[in-house]
A protein has these predicted regions:
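Hydrophobic alpha-helical bundle cores within soluble ligand-binding/oligomerization subdomains
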Residues: 1-211
Length: 211
């Protein structure tokens, strides 16, 4: 379980746990440094993606926005339908690297649709996934070390694997048909959106607004 993982590995962060789930073991310091550098290098979007995809017809639902971004990446991949393990790993590493931008930009596009100001920041290669999310999320790009640590821990606790919940089970079902990575992950996001799964978080936001 997650608590055992934290006790045994001295609180591995998001990047360490990502490596573990992909390759079956926690990385050494050298492997972790190389992995972080690779993730940072891949944390980019195609030219004009923000203009052509993110800012055009933003949805009132952020998960719908993210699903659209994922599926749009199919268009930019010359080997989108190649489901060999090396290619799927490449695609997944790209998506893992890009998800902080997808999440934050979906939030900003959603707020822009509601008439609020828009600001889009590029990720910083020296920052972790959690730090980049906080930096890109806020207008002043400021955050504390404690905030980054808490978010990093939250990202680890939310990392799903195996297939016990609806969205991870969806990936097993959809990928078994032999479809591409982008369609599979988009299907999982569609499942996550449901009010009996990740969509339940929307009710928490509504509760805060009511308060």
């Amino acid at each position: 379980c997650s608590s055992d993982l934290f006790l045994k590995a001295e609180h591995p962060g998001f990047e360490e746990t990502t490596y573990l789930l992909l390759f079956g073991e926690l990385p050494t310091k050298v492997q972790l440094d190389e992995f972080r550098a690779m993730i940072a290098e891949r944390r980019t979007l195609p030219p004009n993606f923000v203009r052509d995809v993110i800012m055009k017809a933003p949805s009132s639902d952020m998960m719908n926005n993210i699903s659209r971004y994922i599926l749009s990446m199919y268009t930019y991949d010359d080997k989108a339908d190649d489901i060999s393990i090396p290619n799927v790993l490449r695609q997944c590493l790209n998506l893992i690297s890009q998800f902080p931008m997808f999440m934050v930009y979906a939030y900003h596009a959603y707020n822009y649709r509601r008439g609020e100001d828009l600001y889009i920041y590029a990720p910083h290669p020296e920052l972790s996934a959690a730090e980049n999310i906080l930096m890109m999320l806020r207008e002043d790009r400021k955050y504390t070390a404690l905030e980054a640590e808490i978010l990093d821990m939250a990202l680890v606790l939310h990392m799903d694997h195996g297939g016990g919940n609806n969205s991870t089970f969806t990936t097993h079902v959809v990928t078994s048909s032999g479809t591409d990575t982008y369609s599979t992950i988009t299907a999982a996001m569609a499942s996550l959106k449901g009010p009996k799964h990740g969509g339940a978080n929307v009710k928490v936001t509504q509760m805060f607004e009511d308060m």
